[in-house]
Amino acid sequence: IRRQRQMCIRDRGYAYAHRIRERAAYDWDAELSIYLAQGTHGHGVGTTVLACLIDLLELQGLRHLYSCVTLPNEKSIRMQRRLGFADAGVWHDSGWKFDGWHDVAWLEKHIGSGKPQPVTPFPALDEKNIQECLQKYMDKLNQVEE
């Protein structure tokens, strides 16, 4: 995950992951973000896309995932908790959005333990594994559309 990785869902939104810190000690940590277009919420699209991204990051050997959510946003918090994220803390009045300061919630998910191996850059992943992962979640997205 040396560079930001982004997954687009047609015209419905995107999700991406990027390094959370530059120091080598944090090579196995990533921050996730997701944006969904209006009308897409509440249909399982966000959960499906984030689950796919998490699986791809696990294939790369990442261990700790973090998500930052501008508050209030209970739907996003619930979705991430369903995926196994836990509350990690709140930064108060730290995000400027919509002409005002907002609290920002941090959530975390651990997807591995023990001594890590070097992270596998996305382009070095086995193409077959990537395609299997993407197909699994595309099938789920297609079910959402039906």
Regions found by a protein language model. Give the residues of each.
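A structural signal for short, well-ordered beta-strand segments
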Residues: 32, 67, 107-109
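Conserved beta-strand in the GNAT
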Residues: 10-19
